[in-house]
């Protein structure tokens, strides 16, 4: 092996960026169903929950899918299904924690952009709480997360009130030395 001379200066470390995209959607259960509506880790009162094996949090699920598109590790449909089957875990917070754990030690979350489409529930009053909860689970600053909400003018099933869908774009910084 060749020895590096002491006068040799290594280049500054480099950061590369990886971008993941995730999507998820779920249909509402009947209004009389007691399952709570959870979005971004926040319970929405007076709105039915979602048809799902888990708690149905489409925001956390879209984020998990965005992580999977960066890390190539299946969280939903893979690890989450296994956690449900073996331990009965339906809490999407646990799935999202597993997604964060799937990052390499050289990777960190830089930014998260989230768009939620649905006629109900009314999201605007809860957006700050949702951002705070996501920041807590991901261990990132609040200003690294933005959430927009739209009804889509009623053009889709989501905008007509049948369910909610979420899209997420995740930016990961990765430390590399060349």
Curated annotation (Swiss-Prot):
Cofactor(s) this protein requires: a divalent metal cation
Site features described as Transition state stabilizer, chain residue numbers: 53, 151
Record-listed 4-CDP-2-C-methyl-D-erythritol 2-phosphate binding positions: 24-26, 150-153
Catalytic activity: 4-CDP-2-C-methyl-D-erythritol 2-phosphate = 2-C-methyl-D-erythritol 2,4-cyclic diphosphate + CMP
Keyword RNA-binding: no
UniProt KW keywords: Isoprene biosynthesis, Lyase, Metal-binding
GO molecular function terms attached to this record: 2-C-methyl-D-erythritol 2,4-cyclodiphosphate synthase activity; metal ion binding
CDD domains: MECDP_synthase
Pathway noted in the entry: Isoprenoid biosynthesis; isopentenyl diphosphate biosynthesis via DXP pathway; isopentenyl diphosphate from 1-deoxy-D-xylulose 5-phosphate: step 4/6
PROSITE patterns attached to this UniProt entry: ISPF
EC class (word): lyase
Residues bound to a divalent metal cation: 24, 26, 61
E.C. code: 4.6.1.12
Statement: the UniProt record of this protein carries the keyword Metal-binding: yes
Cofactor binding description: Binds 1 divalent metal cation per subunit.
NCBIfam families documented for this protein: ispF
Xref: HAMAP family: IspF
Protein role: Involved in the biosynthesis of isopentenyl diphosphate (IPP) and dimethylallyl diphosphate (DMAPP), two major building blocks of isoprenoid compounds. Catalyzes the conversion of 4-diphosphocytidyl-2-C-methyl-D-erythritol 2-phosphate (CDP-ME2P) to 2-C-methyl-D-erythritol 2,4-cyclodiphosphate (ME-CPP) with a corresponding release of cytidine 5-monophosphate (CMP).
Entries under PANTHER family matching the protein: 2-C-METHYL-D-ERYTHRITOL 2,4-CYCLODIPHOSPHATE SYNTHASE, CHLOROPLASTIC (PTHR43181:SF1)
The family this protein is said to belong to: Belongs to the IspF family.
Description of how the protein assembles with itself and partners: Homotrimer.
Protein's UniProt name: 2-C-methyl-D-erythritol 2,4-cyclodiphosphate synthase
């Amino acid at each position: 092996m060749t020895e590096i001379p002491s006068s040799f200066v290594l280049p500054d470390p480099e950061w590369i960026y990886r971008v993941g995209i995730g999507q998820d959607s779920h249909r509402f259960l009947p209004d009389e169903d007691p399952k709570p509506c959870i979005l971004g880790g926040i319970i929405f009162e007076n709105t039915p929950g979602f048809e799902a094996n888990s708690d149905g949090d489409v925001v956390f699920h879209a984020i998990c899918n965005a992580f999977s598109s960066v890390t190539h590790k299946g969280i939903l449909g893979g690890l989450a299904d296994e956690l449900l089957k073996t331990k009965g875990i339906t809490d999407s917070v646990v799935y999202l924690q597993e997604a964060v754990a799937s990052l390499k030690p050289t990777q960190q979350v830089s930014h998260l952009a989230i768009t939620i489409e649905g006629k109900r529930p009314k999201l605007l009053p809860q957006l700050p709480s949702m951002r705070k909860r996501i920041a807590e689970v991901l261990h990132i600053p609040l200003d690294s997360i933005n959430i927009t909400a739209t009804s889509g003018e009623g053009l889709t099933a989501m905008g007509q009130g049948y369910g909610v869908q979420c899209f997420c774009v995740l930016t990961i910084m990765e430390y590399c030395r060349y």
